[in-house]
A protein has these predicted regions:
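Positively charged n-region of N-terminal signal peptides that target proteins for export
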Residues: 1-4
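Bacterial N-terminal signal peptides
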Residues: 7-19
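Signal peptide processing junction and immediate N-terminal pro/mature segment
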Residues: 17-28
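Asp-box/BNR beta-propeller blade signature and adjacent active/binding-site loops
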Residues: 28-388
Length: 388
């Protein structure tokens, strides 16, 4: 009876979406065969095929990366702020926490250096992961906790503020952070919702260099499942000053929402024409002014099908592609109204491997370093080689 009830809810929600999906947004494919020959082309030392206009980079850390000053870059690991002066070959560690036994930073995190030089880190604390007990009968884990925190440094990462708890609800992932033109910092997080269990997205805004934070409205489109709802968003500021955020969904496309008050509230929620598997993308403004998007498409290039997962109201209500065998890139000159043709820049060559959860770092103007939270692939490319 419960499953029938949820099935009706899912059907009604999908009916509400009819008309939102443009007819030309269906995942495009003219063949049903893999169009990338991994037996030829470039291979990385970790076994991935990469586009011939990209190169492998020798860097062990996953990111996210920031530029501290010329020839100095930084990132974090589970408990340290890390600084490199040799393009990531070696790292000097500075402890983030006075008591590291209480904190463990998850791989999905966000780090930024503001225009005033403040370092801000947002993360979910795995040390406080608790009470996860998903029920296949009620389709929920109502007491689950995985808190969101933020902290800052005023001395280039040598010392850090006490982590500030922003919410205790289960945080599926923290994926992105930006500074707006007027100096406000906004990062995206997640918050689990219940009855039934599913995920939602929230953002936090700071107008004082990370000292205090204001939470946005909760972006909740419903869902039923421990991987359902809207999740793992990436955001950027548009030329008109508004913010745009792309949301991972299980509905075949990124959805988007916009804010005209620096992420304090979000509205105009709708589907985009960008087909996407159930995986997060990374959406960034480059020094050139272009936008770039790195993500996993719904199908492998050249194919019309892919094994689906979910549809059981425990993983998700709708069956969905979890395609993570390829990573693609595209660019926009007009704030995402139009995009260049997607190009596959990386592909797995071994079973049970993936390329997913990208971090994007513009190492120098037009030079993009791409790393992944859940893949050993590390690669670099030049913007000029992929735009006309």
């Amino acid at each position: 009876m419960i499953k029938q009830f949820y099935a009706i809810l899912f059907f009604l929600s999908m009916q509400a979406c009819i008309g939102i999906f443009p007819l030309d947004t269906q995942a495009q494919s003219n063949t049903n065969r893999d169009t990338i020959n991994v037996r030829s082309g470039n291979k990385t030392s970790t076994g991935f095929w990469i586009h011939d206009k990209t190169r492998e980079i020798n860097i062990s850390r996953i990111g996210p990366f920031i530029q501290m000053k010329k020839d100095v870059m930084a990132t974090v690991d589970t408990s340290n702020f890390l600084v490199s002066t040799d393009e990531g070959l070696t790292w000097k560690a500075f402890p983030l926490f006075k008591d590291s036994s209480k904190f463990f930073i998850r791989p999905e995190r966000a780090l930024i250096k503001t225009k005033k030089g403040t370092l801000i880190l947002a993360f979910a604390n795995d040390k406080e992961r608790a009470k996860w007990n998903w029920s296949k009968d009620t389709h929920d884990s109502p007491e689950a906790e995985l808190p969101t925190y933020a902290m800052y440094s005023k001395d280039s990462g040598k010392s850090w503020s006490q982590p500030q708890l922003l919410h205790k609800e289960w945080t599926g992932a923290i994926r992105d952070i930006i500074e707006t033109k007027d100096g406000q910092v906004v990062f995206s997080s997640m918050m689990m919702r219940h009855n039934p269990g599913h995920h939602a997205v929230v953002t936090y805004n700071s107008a004082d260099e990370g000292k205090t934070w204001t939470r946005s409205n909760i972006i909740d489109l419903g869902g039923v499942g421990d991987h359902d709802g809207v999740t793992e968003s990436t955001l950027e500021q548009m030329k008109d000053g508004s913010l745009k955020m792309l949301l991972r969904t299980n509905w075949g496309y990124f959805w988007q929402t916009s804010s005209t008050n620096n992420g304090l509230s979000w509205k105009n929620l709708k589907s985009t024409p960008i087909d996407a598997s159930s995986s997060p993308g990374m959406f960034k403004r480059l020094k050139s002014g272009r936008l770039v998007l790195v993500w996993n498409r719904y199908y492998p290039q050249g194919k019309k099908s892919y094994p689906l997962r979910g549809g059981d109201y425990n993983f998700s209500a709708a069956p969905v592609s979890m395609h993570r065998e390829e990573i693609s890139i595209m660019f926009s000159d007009d704030d995402g109204k139009n995009w260049s043709q997607p190009v596959v820049i990386g592909k797995t060559t071994e079973p049970k491997t993936q390329i997913a959860y990208p971090y994007l770092f513009e190492k120098s103007p037009g030079e993009l370093w791409i790393s992944f939270a859940f893949s050993k692939l590390r690669m670099a490319l030049y913007e000029k080689d992929f735009v006309q």
